[in-house]
Amino acid sequence: MTKGLKKFIFSPFLFSLAIGGHPISIDGSFGDWVEVPIIYSDNNDDAIEADFSTLKITYDSEFLFIYFRFHEGEFLMQDWNDFHLYIDVDNDHLTGHQANGVGAELVWNFGNRSGYFMINDQQIPIMQNDIKLRVAPTITSREFEIAIGLDSPGLTLDGDQQFSNGKIVLSEVNGGGDYIPDDEGGLNFLVSDDDQTLFEPISIERYDENNIRVLSYNTLNNGIIDID
């Protein structure tokens, strides 16, 4: 069995390399992506607004990880955008949503924070938790990393298959928007069951029992201090 993730489309801007999976922490720091090879590098100045630069893909036993970067500017992935992710999970361009030469069973609209998966020509709406989606950073940035659960209905066709390979397209749908890849047909990738370095969870234990810990987080409402 072929192991790792491999790029199959050949172009001066594509790089082909078989690799094993990498455990990635979706924290917006990107240091754990250094060892993951670029599978697509896009031309500069081929878009009006959001101009994609590079794309990386890897995985562990639970998640598919995707990293992408823009040539210039900063963007907010949670709102105010028309970025779409398309994944063809059955490698059949005749099924699913038609997008730049692929038939995507999983479609995600980052700006709307929603999407759908297609099965038997029906669109099944999904939200972030349905595909275990993680996106970082949650502020404006030039680069982003995301994770999607390998057992999510969008990748398993609602449990009918174990996801092992597919094709991906990333786009800004607005007029003049950019695509990864530029050519139709998407980017092929594999998810294998090769041996992987286990992710080491970050401990939340106190270094010193005498320390006092203060936790802060963003909320939609002031539930912590507003008793109503």
Question: Which residues fall in each region the model found?
Answer:
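Acidic/polar low-complexity flexible segments
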Residues: 21-29, 82, 86-113, 139-141, ...
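Glycine-aromatic-enriched beta-strand/loop faces of beta-sandwich-type recognition domains
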Residues: 107-139
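N-terminal, active-site-proximal structural segment of metallo-dependent hydrolase catalytic domains
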Residues: 192-228
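Short, solvent-exposed loop/turn elements at domain surfaces
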Residues: 32-38, 75-77, 94-95, 213, ...
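A short beta-turn/strand-edge loop motif at beta-sheet boundaries
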Residues: 46, 73-79, 154-160
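Short, well-ordered beta-strand segments enriched in hydrophobic/aromatic residues
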Residues: 28, 62-72, 144-150
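Low-complexity, serine/threonine/proline/glycine-rich extracellular segments that form mucin-like
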Residues: 60-65, 69-89
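Sec-dependent N-terminal signal peptides
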Residues: 4-20
